[in-house]
Amino acid sequence: MSRLVVVSNRIAPPDEHAASAGGLAVGILGALKAAGGLWFGWSGETGNEDQPLKKVKKGNITWASFNLSEQDLDEYYNKFSNAVLWPAFHYRLDLVQFQRPAWDGYLRVNALLADKLLPLLQDDDIIWIHDYHLLPFAHELRKRGVNNRIGFFLHIPFPTPEIFNALPTYDTLLEQLCDYDLLGFQTENDRLAFLDCLSNLTRVTTRSAKSHTACGKAFRTEVYPIGIEPKEIAKQAAGPLPPKLAQLKAELKNVQNIFSVERLDYSKGLPERFLAYEALLEKYPQHHGKIRYTQIAPTSRGDVQAYQDIRHQLENEAGRINGKYGQLGWTPLYYLNQHFDRKLLMKIFRYSDVGLVTPLRDGMNLVAKEYVAAQDPANPGVLVLSQFAGAANELTSALIVNPYDRDEVAAALDRALTMSLAERISRHAEMLDVIVKNDINHWQECFISDLKQIVPRSAESQQRDKVATFPKLA
């Protein structure tokens, strides 16, 4: 049986428990355990890139990690992946900071990683590449004679042509993506956006619904909405509360709790969310003294100016809202800029009456799914969810809102706070059914199954070389 080789920017080391490593690690480890294989990625450390790979083997899985030099980390990761691709793919061209040296570094590191992986590959390996850090990776492997089946999954949104084509190197990136055999996206909108971008660049021939030829390469596109481990989350949420949390729950027994958690990022719509909560307090004064909104937003990429700006903005807004609406004995908004243990968050989800998840743009947003999975089915909370989160395509029984419309979000919060138990149970059951069906294992099994069905390029190379491509005609 073919091995599975997984390549991602970071790897979850074997001594890190899967539950604490997050959803992606759970899915990848499940796929690797089923097939056996290799997980290849950055160690998270800087140092001499010429050092041998660090390898750890446990069971039928090998972890191979490498260091990056300070320059390569800065150019490949900070200045291109996170300062160009991340904002552009989240529709924030105003935050893109394109620099040619960073682009050169991005290509250089992808080539370097291909060189490091090449000696580890076997002829029948199936290769699965993850996320925007590694868009050119298949292209680099093909240049080195690798004809194995190579799949790619994009965890973040793919932008429309008006956005993507503004990147100075958009054409090169699109051509490089065609070197994958299978391109997986979170939503149908993302898949179609990629094909629209490609069609603007060159002629795309669609042989069947999702099989295409462009730039002289044949490839498939498909949608694979990533899932979670609902049973594990329910188990974590239902366990006994730590003493401090139990005390807090007792103190707030007569208060309805609105809860949000995500890392501090401009794509999450936190300033807009604070203003929507203010609109709730203004338009629905009957809730004064009876609700509390808690926002947990641990710092991420704190050295980037855009992230520093949003942190200061949120701190100012939280103080202003509390100063305007707070009363003796009641603070309407708690903003916590710190990290909390994931298991503890599942317990907080369970006793929260409303889960507020309103990103301005998100590939999927697993927090929305985790909130649903953590609820008590007999007395569940209500999910208020942005229409621009990939999860909105599946969790249609949530209260779907436009995060840019503060009045709509405020009205949804009021509805959630006053919703009957029967309606809450019905909505939760419908969403939980979807989450259980499309869990993390279903996600990885579908992707790997589809990738295995593709004929390796070594068997099709002569036929593909005969495919003519033409530029897009005006």
From Swiss-Prot:
Site (Involved in alpha anomer selectivity): W86, I156
Reaction(s) catalysed by this chain's protein: D-glucose 6-phosphate + UDP-alpha-D-glucose = alpha,alpha-trehalose 6-phosphate + UDP + H(+)
Annotated residues for binding of UDP-alpha-D-glucose: G22, G23, R263, K268, F340, L366, V367, A368, K369, E370
InterPro entries linked to this entry: Glyco_trans_20 (IPR001830), Trehalose_OtsA (IPR012766)
Methyltransferase is among the record's keywords: no
Function (record text): Probably involved in the osmoprotection via the biosynthesis of trehalose. Catalyzes the transfer of glucose from UDP-alpha-D-glucose (UDP-Glc) to D-glucose 6-phosphate (Glc-6-P) to form trehalose-6-phosphate. Acts with retention of the anomeric configuration of the UDP-sugar donor.
Oligomer and partners: Homotetramer.
UniProt-recorded name of the protein: Trehalose-6-phosphate synthase
Protein source organism: Escherichia coli O6:H1 (strain CFT073 / ATCC 700928 / UPEC)
